[in-house]
């Protein structure tokens, strides 16, 4: 299948990040007290839970999902076992709204025309699933858009997991600068989820006090 240009450029980086994030848990235990990391993510029941049939397909659900939506209507988009909730009127006008760091909380006019959303899912059958959305857009700060990522490796899902935002060079825990964006884990239903304010890339990985580099040639500091 053909991936969007930005998705193709990051495909290898997301795969590498999933592997290196395993180092994070071990090294975090050496550098910090275990209690601090386990308190990082709050446990909460996910309002979105995939069916057993949807979970059974995990492993074949990596790939590209495309949806043509009416932004004036509330949407719940199924991404294999994961999901995205977009309330009516949440999408900022794609052509006229600002986009980028520092703009996520700016007011905006809503998108009114139907549009196509593309989501590229990778590593769905692991405990480090990722998704990348196109086009680049942001959501009205007065609306709450939620991303729910299913984690299939049940043995490793705990309160150290964070849903990171990834740009072209690194992944960031956005909750350090915006309390609205803190992650939650549902260890019973094996979900990691949080509110998001823009379309970019997102990946589930262990908590770290530093950004995660997408360039495996850099010192990740784990």
Name the predicted role of every residue range.
Residues 220-222:
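Short, solvent-exposed mixed-charge patches
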Residues 191-214:
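C-terminal beta-strand-rich structural cap/linker in extracellular carbohydrate-active enzymes
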Residues 24-26:
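C-terminal motif of bacterial Sec signal peptides marking the signal peptidase cleavage site
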């Amino acid at each position: 299948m053909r991936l969007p240009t930005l998705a193709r450029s990051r495909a290898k980086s997301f795969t590498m990040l999933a592997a290196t994030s395993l180092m994070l848990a071990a090294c975090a235990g050496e550098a910090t007290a275990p209690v601090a990391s386990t308190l990082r993510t709050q446990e909460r029941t996910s309002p979105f839970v995939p069916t057993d049939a949807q979970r059974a397909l995990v492993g074949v659900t990596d790939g590209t999902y495309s949806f043509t939506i009416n932004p004036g209507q509330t949407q719940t988009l199924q991404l294999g076992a994961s999901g995205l909730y977009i309330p009516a009127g949440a999408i900022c006008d794609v052509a006229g709204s600002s986009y980028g760091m520092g703009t996520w909380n700016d007011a905006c006019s809503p998108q009114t025309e139907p549009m196509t959303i593309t989501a590229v899912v990778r590593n769905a059958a692991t405990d480090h699933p990722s998704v990348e959305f196109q086009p680049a857009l942001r959501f009205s700060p007065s609306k709450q858009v939620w991303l729910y990522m299913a984690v299939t490796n049940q043995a490793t899902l705990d309160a150290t997991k964070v849903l990171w935002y990834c740009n072209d060079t690194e992944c960031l825990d956005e909750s350090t600068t915006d309390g609205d964006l803190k992650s939650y884990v549902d260890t019973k239903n094996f979900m990691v989820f949080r509110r998001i304010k823009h379309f970019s890339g997102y990946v589930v990985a262990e908590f770290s006090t530093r950004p995660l580099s997408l360039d495996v040639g850099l010192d990740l500091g784990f």
